[in-house]
Regions:
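Intrinsic low-complexity, repeat-rich intrinsically disordered segments enriched
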Residues: 1-45
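Acidic, glycine/polar-enriched metal-coordinating patches/loops
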Residues: 37, 51-140
Length: 140
């Protein structure tokens, strides 16, 4: 497995002695769905996009780092029909059993429903555990 860090500048002189990145970008990975299941392989990156053509009943993440914090941001676009849904009660992480993603106030996840609507859904993992999910809806 090879990793590549692309930055224009890395500076160690920051006010909190952390590393400052300039010119940072993330690599998109392919996000696919089949028979209502979204498959996300985080080996190659932490962002991806999908246009929904069916209701999603299961989201399967693979290669989520077992230690530390990691995230995945998914651009979700409704197809020309719209009204597609994404369930978060059957999420698997690295081949484990189904878990229900955690959302603010236990409100669940409701996507925008209009044809061609665009939402951003973020998944945050601590030690490859149950994802914390947040969304930004209805970009237009």
């Amino acid at each position: 497995m090879s990793s590549e860090l692309k930055v224009d500048t890395i500076s160690e002189k920051t006010s909190n002695n952390g590393v400052e990145l300039k010119g940072y970008k993330e690599t998109d990975v392919a996000v696919t769905s089949s028979s209502g299941v979204i498959a996300v392989d985080m080996t190659g990156g932490n962002t991806g996009a999908i246009t929904l053509s069916e209701n999603i009943t299961d989201i399967d993440f693979t290669n989520v780092p077992a230690n530390g914090t990691s995230s995945f941001t998914m651009k979700v676009t409704q197809d020309g029909t719209g009204s597609r849904t994404m369930a978060i009660n059957a999420i698997t992480v690295n081949g484990g059993g189904n878990v229900t993603g955690l959302t603010p106030g236990a409100a669940g996840l409701t996507l925008s429903t209009g044809a061609n609507d665009v939402d951003l859904v973020s998944f945050l993992f601590f030690d490859a555990g149950t994802p914390l999910i947040n969304s930004l809806l209805d970009f237009s």
